[in-house]
């Protein structure tokens, strides 16, 4: 489908077809191996013992076992399905997203507070009814790798559904141009089945009132990450009768981050994931598998290899985390208020397109100062495991790579969009992410 609304994609990301295939196979395998490695028999004071990748992979059951396991599928589908129903029925304020290419704006229900409150209440009730045993958390901990594999398979099927559905015209409504044509992602309409399936063909796939992309971004993966962390804390306490300060710290740091993201979810509406990227395997796998099953790596590690930090290290790590939060939120708030016309005193560059490029306040320090704050937060999580193993620093390294890629994508887009105005902006704000470093 090629039209004025949906032109043919001519620029490919991630190495095109070969890169899409490599990531679609390599990242899931990497995620499974990573989770297989967090086992007591593979660690002595944080170092690998008798590491054998073949043995690790052989510890995974055949694919047909997971495809046909009704119990695992029931558990995961109930998790996704119940959250989807709650997302639709729980109250929340309705906000408009950014203007789309057809001139329309989609409506989004912002009900993160109601969703978070519901989850906390359910956990509290189950804690009371089971005398603190919480068999659901025990099941999650004991079937961690199996549920990881199920989430990957679910991501595959969800991406396939969204790809096929992208070819079906709008049925119950028309787009902003008065036609039945769906809006496709500019980067996902190449005509190559595998690449478009991976990168995401439809921009905003919806199933009735459910926006699949925004829901997947904020609900099943993020909240499962929280539960996995709690299951690690719960398992360690049941096993040893005590909890180490590092494990408590990781639960606090990441729990704070998760609830902050859910409670401030309206900020997602202007993120590239929502405004620009289609919803394909890349986002489905990232949201549903990579986030919960690799971001929880620190908690998983500390549940099998405890670390006692002491209050000095705890305070230092907290300071790094809150510094990151301050930079991240202050910078984002400043840019948001500037766009709303509340901070007209800040210096900016007037572009030929009629918009302004902010180059003052936080945004005089670097082009993506918010990325630096976000990365400091990620570093604090890894530091909670101290320097026992490089494995737990995976997230900080991965996140740095992700932020660099986003920065380069944004820079390429802005060069094309603003031309000489962007060159002037780069002269005034030369640093990309970290002031005086990069």
Swiss-Prot record:
InterPro entries noted in UniProt: ERG24_DHCR-like (IPR001171), Sterol_reductase_CS (IPR018083)
Keywords tagged on the record: Lipid biosynthesis, Lipid metabolism, Membrane, NADP, Oxidoreductase, Steroid biosynthesis, Steroid metabolism, Sterol biosynthesis, Sterol metabolism, Transmembrane, Transmembrane helix
GO molecular-function terms, A-Z: Delta14-sterol reductase activity; NADP binding
A Pfam family annotated for this UniProt entry: ERG4_ERG24
Binding site residues for NADP(+): 335, 339, 358, 363, 370-371, 410, 414-418, 425
UniProt membrane topology term: Multi-pass membrane protein
Listed PROSITE patterns: STEROL_REDUCT_1 (PS01017), STEROL_REDUCT_2 (PS01018)
Lumenal side: 1-13, 91-109, 173-242, 329-368
Cytoplasmic topology ranges: 35-71, 128-147, 264-308, 388-438
Enzyme class per UniProt: oxidoreductase
Activity: how regulated: Inhibited by the morpholine antifungal drug fenpropimorph.
Pathway: Steroid biosynthesis; zymosterol biosynthesis; zymosterol from lanosterol: step 2/6
Gene Ontology biological-process annotations: ergosterol biosynthetic process
EC number assigned by the record: 1.3.1.70
Transmembrane segments: 14-34, 72-90, 110-127, 148-172, 243-263, 309-328, 369-387
Localization terms from the record: Membrane
Catalysed reaction equations from the record: 4,4-dimethyl-5alpha-cholesta-8,24-dien-3beta-ol + NADP(+) = 4,4-dimethyl-5alpha-cholesta-8,14,24-trien-3beta-ol + NADPH + H(+)
Family listed: Belongs to the ERG4/ERG24 family.
Note: Present with 1600 molecules/cell in log phase SD medium.
Free-text function comment from the UniProt entry: Delta(14)-sterol reductase; part of the third module of ergosterol biosynthesis pathway that includes the late steps of the pathway. ERG24 reduces the C14=C15 double bond of 4,4-dimethyl-cholesta-8,14,24-trienol to produce 4,4-dimethyl-cholesta-8,24-dienol. The third module or late pathway involves the ergosterol synthesis itself through consecutive reactions that mainly occur in the endoplasmic reticulum (ER) membrane. Firstly, the squalene synthase ERG9 catalyzes the condensation of 2 farnesyl pyrophosphate moieties to form squalene, which is the precursor of all steroids.
The protein, known as: Delta(14)-sterol reductase ERG24
Gene coding for it: ERG24
